[in-house]
Curated annotation (Swiss-Prot):
EC number(s) per entry: 3.5.4.19
Protein name according to UniProt: Phosphoribosyl-AMP cyclohydrolase
Gene assigned in the entry: hisI
Record flagged with keyword Ribonucleoprotein: no
Family under the similarity heading: Belongs to the PRA-CH family.
Length: 147
């Protein structure tokens, strides 16, 4: 199954229609929110280009586009922590994607943590923003996995 990605469509068709018509930004990317299918926890936020979205739909595994590396990558290609996609959704105007996954290896973050969202914004005694670890246990050692 290949995803049609027609760029232009009537607003009603985009918001209420049944045809996948992702609205990619000027760089050809769409934001992807990835959550754990069982717990609902946010694991990561990444980007997909047209090819990454098609590969994700066709393979049932999460593919993303790395802005820093300028290339497509399959989640888990280095770590072995592959994301098996159970559901894909788009938002109302199809400019964001939400995928629900089973996270292989238990960790989605390259830092070795379950989620990339392992710090909460709190305030110090003077009221300045301060980052506090939350659910920050490392499930693997990145130095050993990404050699």
């Amino acid at each position: 199954m290949s995803a049609p990605t027609t760029p232009a469509a009537a607003l009603d068709d985009v918001e209420e229609g049944v045809v996948l018509r992702p609205k990619f930004d000027a760089a050809g990317l769409v934001t992807c929110v990835t959550t754990d299918a069982q717990s609902g926890d946010v694991l990561m936020v990444a980007f997909m280009n047209d090819e990454a979205l098609k590969k994700t739909i066709d393979s049932g595994e999460a593919w993303y586009f790395s802005r820093s590396r300028g290339r497509l990558w399959r989640k888990g290609e280095s770590s072995g922590h592959v994301q098996r996609v159970l559901e894909i959704r788009v938002d109302c105007d199809q400019d964001a994607v939400w995928i629900k996954v089973e996270q292989g290896g238990g960790a989605a973050c390259h830092t070795g943590r379950k989620s990339c969202f392992y710090r909460r914004v709190d305030r110090d005694a003077e009221g300045a923003p301060l980052l506090s670890p939350v659910d920050a246990e490392r499930l693997f050692d990145p130095a050993k996995v990404y050699r």
